[in-house]
Amino acid sequence: MKEHSIDIQLSHPDDLFHLFGSNERHLRLMEEELDVVIHARTEIVQVLGEEAACEEARQVIQALMVLVNRGMTVGTPDVVTAISMVKNDEIDKFVALYEEEIIKDNTGKPIRVKTLGQKLYVDSVKQHDVTFGIGPAGTGKTFLAVTLAVTALKRGQVKRIILTRPAVEAGESLGFLPGDLKEKVDPYLRPVYDALYQILGKDQTTRLMEREIIEIAPLAYMRGRTLEDAFVILDEAQNTTIMQMKMFLTRLGFNSKMIVNGDISQIDLPRNVKSGLIDAQEKLKNIHQIDFVHFSAKDVVRHPVVAQIIRAYEPAPVKNEEREEVQEEIE
């Protein structure tokens, strides 16, 4: 097939650095993911390759240049998102992701959605009392949930944040680990702590936890409570039983929001126990103030190979097939 060539005119020589990053790491990423060769010289970017691939590269570069011209810093996640969107014929929606800033992190860096799935998730949380975020790791579910909770707290929309998860892990018997239940579960809540530290900083997070404005606790600690004026997040919800999920959801009080996050491809419950997350999808789908947002490999904002790994496991994971047979027997 004949090699195609496209020249893209930039506004300023400095645009090359802002667009392609230090050591041209973004340029190499585009070349690898789009199967093109890119030559960057002063204010001209030349793209070589098959015509369709060159056109995709042109669209990615022009979309990223909109951010550069607005004075935004283009990072690797932005390039990954643009590449993913052009491959899914969604590049025309790329710039819209950057129109709204959710909040600034501890260093003053704006936090925005990175994919269309994330935007749908954020909009759903704003519009519903209970939002389920279901999808693979790397799609930003936990980080976005914590971001939205902190935003609501800072705006005075809620008085506290409660973060919880079930105490079930594959290959770990918590009963044989030292410490009480909270101490046993804390290491598994690391992604939640990481998100809080990035958004609030470690010192402020610690102060808010000491004042019990932020509470991080195992799911078992939710029993018997009514959670009012609170933003409540349940992570790793695929590992709840049906009764645990019912118990959690019925804790919802007035002026509260709930987010339930999980990945139904990573269930660690015993084979004969049905996941409360799967059950909730079936039973609650027609309730007006409850919404389900499904993420896919398209929403992965980690290294591009992670999305490829997720896709490789999506068609027919053995674990899921076995589980579906068991679920049918249970029902």
Regions from the PLM with identified roles:
Residues 19, 57-60, 245:
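Hydrophobic side chains in well-ordered alpha-helices
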Residues 13, 24, 51-52, 239, ...:
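Short, surface-exposed acidic/glycine-rich loop or hinge patches that mediate macromolecular interfaces
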Residues 1-18:
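Short glycine-/aliphatic-rich beta-strand segments at the starts of folded cytosolic domains
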Residues 39-98:
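Interdomain "pre-motor" coupling segment immediately N-terminal to P-loop NTPase/helicase cores
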Residues 44, 106-234, 238-331:
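Conserved helicase motor core of SF1/SF2 NTP-dependent helicases
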Residues 87-109, 113-116:
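Conserved loop-to-helix interface motifs that mediate assembly, gating, or partner/ligand docking
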Residues 15-32:
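Short amphipathic alpha-helix segments
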Residues 28-29, 34-37, 43:
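Compact, well-ordered interaction domains used in eukaryotic information-processing assemblies
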